[in-house]
C-alpha cells in the first residue's frame, strides 16, 4: 500500500468539497475495540499533535441543556432524560439496540453535531497535522468524519488480542465484547480502507517504533499540503 497515495475506498475519505480544502493534514485514526487506538492517540499527543476525539465530542454534544439533547428529547420523548436532566445513556442504548431504526434516527441528530464540532476543533488546531480519532470512522460513513481526512491510519490486532485487552481494560464479558465486534468491520475489511496499518500485537515500545516513521511521514505530507495550498 502506497505511503502517499490513498487506497481506493467506497467510503471515499478524499477531500470532496471546498470545506475540506484545508492547509492542515488530517489523519483519521481508527480500529476495532482493543486495537490500541487510545495508546496511539496518546503517543501522537505527546509529539505535540492535536487530537480530535470523536468519542469525547459525542458526549459533549449531548450535555444537559444542549440543543442536540433537546432535539433528541423532542424526537423520542422525555424518557431519554434522567432525573437530573442529563441524557439517560443506558435507556437510550437499550432502546436503539432493541429498535435498529431508532439508532438511525438518533444518529441523524447526533452525527451532524459531532461533525460540526470536529470541524470547529480542526479550524482551531495549531499543530503541524491533526489526528481525528473515531472508532467507527469507516463504518459510520454517513457521519462524514472520514471525508475530513486525507489519510486513514488503522490500528490492527488479532481478535484474540482484542478480546484479551478489552476484557482486562473495561471488565467486559467476552460475550459483550464479541457483540461490539460484530457491529464493527472485520480486520480485513477495515484494513482495505486504510492508507497505513499498524499491527499492534506487542507492548507499547513496539507500538511506538511503528508510529515514529509514520509521524515523520505525516510531517512531510503536512508540509507538502501547506505549500500546495499557498
Curated annotation (Swiss-Prot):
CDD domains in the cross-refs: DPCK (cd02022)
InterPro entries assigned: Depp_CoAkinase, P-loop_NTPase
Taxonomy, superkingdom: Bacteria
Protein's pathway: Cofactor biosynthesis; coenzyme A biosynthesis; CoA from (R)-pantothenate: step 5/5
Disulfide bonds: none
PANTHER family linked to this entry: BIFUNCTIONAL COENZYME A SYNTHASE-RELATED (PTHR10695:SF46), DEPHOSPHO-COA KINASE-RELATED (PTHR10695)
Record-given protein name: Dephospho-CoA kinase
Amino acid at each position: 500500500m502506497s505511503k502517499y497515495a490513498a487506497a481506493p475506498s467506497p467510503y471515499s475519505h478524499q477531500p470532496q468539497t471546498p470545506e475540506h480544502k484545508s492547509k492542515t493534514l488530517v489523519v483519521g485514526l481508527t480500529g476495532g475495540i482493543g486495537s490500541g487506538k487510545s495508546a496511539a492517540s496518546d503517543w501522537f499527543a505527546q509529539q505535540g499533535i492535536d487530537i480530535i476525539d470523536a468519542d469525547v465530542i459525542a458526549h459533549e454534544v449531548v450535555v444537559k441543556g444542549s440543543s442536540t439533547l433537546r432535539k433528541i428529547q423532542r424526537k423520542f420523548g422525555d424518557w431519554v432524560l434522567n432525573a437530573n436532566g442529563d441524557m439517560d445513556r443506558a435507556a437510550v442504548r437499550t432502546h436503539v439496540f432493541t429498535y435498529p431504526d431508532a439508532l438511525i434516527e438518533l444518529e441523524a441528530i447526533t452525527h451532524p453535531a459531532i461533525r460540526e464540532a470536529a470541524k470547529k476543533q480542526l479550524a482551531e488546531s495549531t499543530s503541524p497535522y491533526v489526528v481525528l480519532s473515531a472508532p467507527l470512522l469507516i463504518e459510520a460513513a454517513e457521519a462524514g468524519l472520514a471525508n475530513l481526512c486525507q489519510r486513514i491510519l488503522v490500528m490492527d490486532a488479532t481478535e484474540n488480542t482484542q478480546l484479551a485487552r478489552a476484557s482486562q481494560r473495561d471488565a467486559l464479558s467476552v460475550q459483550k465484547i464479541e457483540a461490539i465486534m460484530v457491529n464493527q468491520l472485520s480486520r480485513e475489511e477495515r484494513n482495505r480502507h486504510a492508507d497505513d496499518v499498524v499491527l499492534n500485537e506487542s507492548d507499547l515500545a513496539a507500538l511506538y517504533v511503528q508510529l515514529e516513521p509514520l509521524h515523520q511521514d505525516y510531517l512531510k505530507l503536512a508540509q507538502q499540503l501547506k505549500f500546495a495550498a499557498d
